[in-house]
């Protein structure tokens, strides 16, 4: 959605390189940085054009350089370009719920126009320091490994780190299913440079679970903003800001607690690096844009909780080649309250969700926040798994029989703990055939205490695999014996 200035300011295209377009304006009439420009009309081949570009640089000699928000196919030099006099603006408020938008805030779900008057520009300052809310509180997700080892902060930022195909999107879909249905507030999902198929699956999943009510959109609890893999880098670079702007309105004006899901934050960085060289910037480490820290900071600092309302954000972060030291994930780490790291090794063992219990962290896991019982159980689980990890080399070389009695017991319990950290998901029912489970935090803590205390030493480890709470594991063991 692009607003037009009263006095039309018209320029013409002088150069097109991929998604980057140079435009010449009359002297003294240059648009401002981040202004939206529109290119409409017909080219020489008779193609209808309707394109929005965003000003990135003022080059001198009355020329500006802009990045296109959709494909530049069919553009030719000399075409007219109109300055709208304002940044890209997107619709906000209740009318956005249950709808799918593109980066410009145009609905793309074939359900007609959005009937609301209010729009906001996607470029806005972050809240002031004095407006921030700092009281820590934890919210329950119903996923055992998350609630026990990396509790999520209400109004915090959580990263889901993982390489290709280890289950980031599935965990995110499960979190949307669990939290959006339990949480009662509103959610915004920004699909940044991910697969179109997953976007479609997610939409259908939400209609089934009732998060989107197709018959009465006002009762829906989520707004979706998509800029998929096949879109030009301009769209992928800005779609996160479009989603965030919708979330900010719910927080600041409606004074609501909002959930913001971003899948995938790496694609936002990747899109920035794709256009960076075309904008004439020198690449920095590993070919990323030199403005990497600023780009990520401008997005992340707006995702925060104020005294008016909160934004709790869950962001998937693709890790290139499983290397957590890559500049993109490393820069994102600095902004997060909790990190849920997914492990390819666990995924290969078939343990889903493949959350690494030793590599994942949370600033919330402190006795004065979660309580002593939760804290001590979580640390005991981690130390048992750490000891098992240390013993694995000895087991590989000498075998289990060479371990002391005590170490053998630790290994047996660690293997049970590892399996009990797996869980059937509601959103994966179609693939696994097992009904999904939501496990309350107290049941999670009780279950791990029983395993570590030795109460369940005589049960086979297979009984703990892909179950909900500990009673299900005991029932499964009975079945296996029977």
Swiss-Prot record:
<dbReference type="GO" id="GO:0016887">
    <property type="term" value="F:ATP hydrolysis activity"/>
</dbReference>
<comment type="function">
    <text>Produces ATP from ADP in the presence of a proton gradient across the membrane. The catalytic sites are hosted primarily by the beta subunits.</text>
</comment>
<keyword id="KW-0067">ATP-binding</keyword>
<dbReference type="InterPro" id="IPR000194">
    <property type="entry name" value="ATPase_F1/V1/A1_a/bsu_nucl-bd"/>
</dbReference>
<dbReference type="Pfam" id="PF22919">
    <property type="entry name" value="ATP-synt_VA_C"/>
</dbReference>
<keyword id="KW-0547">Nucleotide-binding</keyword>
<comment type="subunit">
    <text>F-type ATPases have 2 components, CF(1) - the catalytic core - and CF(0) - the membrane proton channel. CF(1) has five subunits: alpha(3), beta(3), gamma(1), delta(1), epsilon(1). CF(0) has four main subunits: a(1), b(1), b'(1) and c(9-12).</text>
</comment>
<keyword id="KW-0139">CF(1)</keyword>
<keyword id="KW-0472">Membrane</keyword>
<dbReference type="Pfam" id="PF00006">
    <property type="entry name" value="ATP-synt_ab"/>
</dbReference>
<keyword id="KW-0813">Transport</keyword>
<dbReference type="InterPro" id="IPR055190">
    <property type="entry name" value="ATP-synt_VA_C"/>
</dbReference>
<dbReference type="InterPro" id="IPR020003">
    <property type="entry name" value="ATPase_a/bsu_AS"/>
</dbReference>
<dbReference type="InterPro" id="IPR003593">
    <property type="entry name" value="AAA+_ATPase"/>
</dbReference>
<dbReference type="GO" id="GO:0005524">
    <property type="term" value="F:ATP binding"/>
</dbReference>
<keyword id="KW-0066">ATP synthesis</keyword>
<keyword id="KW-0406">Ion transport</keyword>
<dbReference type="Pfam" id="PF02874">
    <property type="entry name" value="ATP-synt_ab_N"/>
</dbReference>
<keyword id="KW-0375">Hydrogen ion transport</keyword>
<comment type="similarity">
    <text>Belongs to the ATPase alpha/beta chains family.</text>
</comment>
<keyword id="KW-1278">Translocase</keyword>
<dbReference type="GO" id="GO:0046933">
    <property type="term" value="F:proton-transporting ATP synthase activity, rotational mechanism"/>
</dbReference>
<keyword id="KW-0793">Thylakoid</keyword>
<feature type="binding site">
    <location>
        <begin position="162"/>
        <end position="169"/>
    </location>
    <ligand>
        <name>ATP</name>
    </ligand>
</feature>
<dbReference type="InterPro" id="IPR024034">
    <property type="entry name" value="ATPase_F1/V1_b/a_C"/>
</dbReference>
<dbReference type="InterPro" id="IPR004100">
    <property type="entry name" value="ATPase_F1/V1/A1_a/bsu_N"/>
</dbReference>
<protein>
    <recommendedName>
        <fullName>ATP synthase subunit beta</fullName>
        <ecNumber>7.1.2.2</ecNumber>
    </recommendedName>
</protein>
<dbReference type="InterPro" id="IPR050053">
    <property type="entry name" value="ATPase_alpha/beta_chains"/>
</dbReference>
<dbReference type="GO" id="GO:0045259">
    <property type="term" value="C:proton-transporting ATP synthase complex"/>
</dbReference>
<dbReference type="GO" id="GO:0031676">
    <property type="term" value="C:plasma membrane-derived thylakoid membrane"/>
</dbReference>
<dbReference type="InterPro" id="IPR036121">
    <property type="entry name" value="ATPase_F1/V1/A1_a/bsu_N_sf"/>
</dbReference>
<dbReference type="InterPro" id="IPR027417">
    <property type="entry name" value="P-loop_NTPase"/>
</dbReference>
<dbReference type="InterPro" id="IPR005722">
    <property type="entry name" value="ATP_synth_F1_bsu"/>
</dbReference>
């Amino acid at each position: 959605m692009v607003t037009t200035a009263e006095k039309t300011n018209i320029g013409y295209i002088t150069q097109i390189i991929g998604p980057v377009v140079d435009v010449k304006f009359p002297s003294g009439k240059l648009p401002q940085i981040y202004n939206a420009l529109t290119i409409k009309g017909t080219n020489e081949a008779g193609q209808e054009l309707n394109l929005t570009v965003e000003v990135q640089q003022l080059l001198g000699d009355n020329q500006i350089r802009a990045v296109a928000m959709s494909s530049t196919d069919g553009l030719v030099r000399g075409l007219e370009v109109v300055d709208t006099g304002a940044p890209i603006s997107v619709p906000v408020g209740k009318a956005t719920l249950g709808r799918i938008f593109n980066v410009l805030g145009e609905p793309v779900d074939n359900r007609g126009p959005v009937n609301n008057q209010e729009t906001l520009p996607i470029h806005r300052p972050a809240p002031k320091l004095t407006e921030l809310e700092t009281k820590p509180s934890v919210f329950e997700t119903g996923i055992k490994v998350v609630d026990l080892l990396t509790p999520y902060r209400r109004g915090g930022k959580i990263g889901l780190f993982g390489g290709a195909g280890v289950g980031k999107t599935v965990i995110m879909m499960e979190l949307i299913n669990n939290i959006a249905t339990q949480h009662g507030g509103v959610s915004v999902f920004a699909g940044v440079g991910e697969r179109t198929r997953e976007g479609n699956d997610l939409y259908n999943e939400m209609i089934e679970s009732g998060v989107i009510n197709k018959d009465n959109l006002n009762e829906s609890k989520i707004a979706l903003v998509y800029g998929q893999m096949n879109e030009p880098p301009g769209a992928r670079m800005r779609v996160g800001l479009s989603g965030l702007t919708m979330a900010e309105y719910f927080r600041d004006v409606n004074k609501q607690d909002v959930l913001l899901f971003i899948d995938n934050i790496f694609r936002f960085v990747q899109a920035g690096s794709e256009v960076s060289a075309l904008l004439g910037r020198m690449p920095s480490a590993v070919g990323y844009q030199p403005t990497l820290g600023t780009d990520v900071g401008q997005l992340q600092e707006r995702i925060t909780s104020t005294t008016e309302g909160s934004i709790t954000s869950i962001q998937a972060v693709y890790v290139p080649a499983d290397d957590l030291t890559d500049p993109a994930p490393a820069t994102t780490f600095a902004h997060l309250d909790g990190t849920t790291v997914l492990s390819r090794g666990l995924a290969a063992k078939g343990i889903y969700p493949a959350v690494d219990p030793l590599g994942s962290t949370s600033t919330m896991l402190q006795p004065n926040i979660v309580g002593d019982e939760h804290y001590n159980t979580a640390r005991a689980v981690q130390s048992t798994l750490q000891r098992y990890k240390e013993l694995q080399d000895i087991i590989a070389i000498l075998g289990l029989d060479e371990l002391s009695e005590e170490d053998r017991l630790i290994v047996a319990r660690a293997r049970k703990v590892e399996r009990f950290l797996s869980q059937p998901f509601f959103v994966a029912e179609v693939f696994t055939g097992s009904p999904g489970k939501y496990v309350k935090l107290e049941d999670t803590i009780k279950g791990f205490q029983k395993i570590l205390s030795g109460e369940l030493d005589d049960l086979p480890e297979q009984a703990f695999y892909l179950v909900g709470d500990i009673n299900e594991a005991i029932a499964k063991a009975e079945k296996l014996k029977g």
